[in-house]
């Protein structure tokens, strides 16, 4: 079987779309690729998308030029981890602190990140 090429997308379901999009755009520097009242799609690097869905807005499916997207809606806590280079970690820690964001924990994984 051929290996998986990469993670295509991560979807988060948010109550406050403007606030969530502003965080990922203004604090983390992700570029907005597409935006609508139900979805903001952002470039998360390496051909990966971060999708922010307004909670409850995806209970009905949607027709797209690429095909039918079935209904979905996330519930409960979620976890997303972004990789940064070891040399860049102090800069990211300072940037997050400048925006009042507390770091719960720093973990170094043997596989990177």
Regions found by a protein language model. Give the residues of each.
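Vicinal oxygen chelate
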Residues: 1-8, 31-84, 90-113
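Polyanion-binding surface elements
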Residues: 11
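Conserved beta-strand-loop-alpha-helix junction that forms the acyl-donor binding cleft
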Residues: 14-17, 110-111
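Short alpha-helical
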Residues: 18-19, 87
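Conserved active-site tyrosine of GNAT-family acetyltransferases
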Residues: 20-25, 96
């Amino acid at each position: 079987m051929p290996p998986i090429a990469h993670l295509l997308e991560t979807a988060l379901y948010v109550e406050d779309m403007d606030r969530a999009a502003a965080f990922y755009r203004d604090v983390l520097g992700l570029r907005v690729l597409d935006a609508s009242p139900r979805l903001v799609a952002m470039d998360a690097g390496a051909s990966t998308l971060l999708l922010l869905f307004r909670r409850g807005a995806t209970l009905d499916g949607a027709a797209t030029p690429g095909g039918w997207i079935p209904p979905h809606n996330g519930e409960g806590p979620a976890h997303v981890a972004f990789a940064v280079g070891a040399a860049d970690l102090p800069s990211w820690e300072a940037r997050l602190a400048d925006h009042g964001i507390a770091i719960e924990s720093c973990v170094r994984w043997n596989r990177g990140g």
